Swiss-Prot record:
Keyword vocabulary terms for this entry: Cell membrane, Membrane, Transmembrane, Transmembrane helix
InterPro entries xrefs: UPF0324_pro (IPR018383)
Pfam families listed in its UniProt record: Cons_hypoth698
Organism: Brucella suis biovar 1 (strain 1330)
Family assignment from sequence similarity: Belongs to the UPF0324 family.
Compartments reported by the entry: Cell membrane
GO cellular component term, pick one: plasma membrane
Name of the protein this chain belongs to: UPF0324 membrane protein BR0028/BS1330_I0028
Keyword Transmembrane helix in record: yes
Length: 336
């Protein structure tokens, strides 16, 4: 990275770090006066970032640093998280859960597409919303768009809902733990099956427990890996008219997933010294909080209106359906 590029990202990165520091201080104040942190620093960072964006929108010079913090730092955090998980955890998950995840994705795409069509969304828009909701948000939308020949307006409108709904899910999903009496294991699986993006799983599960973080990330990674087969199916359905435009390998398998798996393999093979594991876990957590601050800075609440009522309603109903399907899978598998 050149000196000029570093200069370009410093304002946005600095603002994200400042919000992170404020969030961590507020968390400590909570702990001091309330006995515990009812809102974790991760959540506070999102709320503060969104408030800053809404009340005093940062100028263009902050954009590159905000994007850098929200994307690359969060991807690094996910990759580092692999160091806290061993391959035995994947084996213990069992084939039933893996096949169940695939089934949830398939059913969710079908239901979401049906909801979109019932609400009179165009075919391509309905496909984009369905894949974004059921697999991995913006990444799935971006990967699917060239396969089905979606227009840029369709992509922009489909992506608009993920910013707001993604944050809402991260903030509200932990409330289901006491409401539904979910165990840490059940909640981790639920988060992995419903949260849009891999990094957001960290934010949705960290306030609950480390076990929820680990299980949620594993489940979400399996869910993301469904993107390849789903794109292949839609490519076959769409025919040859879009065959000249194919998503690249890193759209189907993002680099941070490979990094996560590599770190997990190193941990499983005992190639990472136990003494540095706490430092790696802390670095992952800190980068995640910084990224959540940046995510909040990138959320424009007014984007929901620009996306259109039908798209928003489709996304909300699809998300509710996905939650119900996921809870059904957890019940069927007898997860305690």
């Amino acid at each position: 990275m050149t000196y000029s590029k570093i200069q370009n990202i410093l304002p946005g990165l600095g603002l994200s770090v400042a919000i992170t520091a404020a969030a961590m201080v507020l968390e400590k104040i909570e702990e001091h006066y309330a006995g515990r942190a009812w809102l974790e620093a991760l959540v506070i960072a999102i709320l503060l970032g969104t408030a800053v964006r809404s009340l005093a929108r940062p100028g263009p010079r902050f954009n590159k640093g905000i994007n850098f913090s929200a994307k690359l730092l969060l991807e690094i955090a996910v990759a580092l998280l692999g160091a806290s998980i061993s391959a035995s955890a994947v084996i213990e998950a069992g084939s039933g859960l893996i096949f169940g995840i695939a089934a949830v994705v398939a059913v969710a795409i079908t239901l979401s597409y049906g909801i979109g069509r019932l609400l009179k969304l165009p075919h391509r828009m309905a496909v984009l919303v369905a894949c974004g909701n059921s697999i991995c948000g913006n990444s799935a939308i971006a990967a699917m768009a060239p396969v089905i020949g979606a227009e840029s307006e369709d992509v922009a409108a489909s992506i608009a809902f993920t910013a707001i709904l993604g944050v809402i899910v991260v903030l509200t999903l932990p409330l289901l733990v006491p409401l539904l009496g979910l165990s840490f294991t059940q909640y981790g699986i639920l988060a992995g099956l419903t949260v849009y993006a891999v990094p957001q799983v960290l934010a949705a599960t960290a306030p609950v427990s480390l076990l929820s973080v680990q299980l949620g990330t594993l489940v979400k990674l399996v869910r993301v890996l469904m993107l390849g087969p789903v794109i292949l199916v839609f490519a076959l359905i769409s025919g040859n008219k879009n065959a000249d435009v194919k998503p690249g390998f890193f759209q189907l398998v993002p680099w941070f997933i490979i990094g996560f798996l590599a770190m997990m393999a190193l941990h499983s093979l005992h190639l990472i010294p136990e003494a540095i594991l706490p430092a790696i876990q802390y670095a992952s957590m800190l980068l995640t909080i910084i990224s959540m601050a940046a995510l909040g800075l990138g959320v424009d609440i007014r984007s929901v209106a620009s996306a259109g009522g039908r798209v928003t309603l489709t996304a909300i109903l699809s998300l509710i359906a996905l939650c119900c399907i996921s809870l059904g899978l957890i019940h069927m598998l007898g997860v305690a």
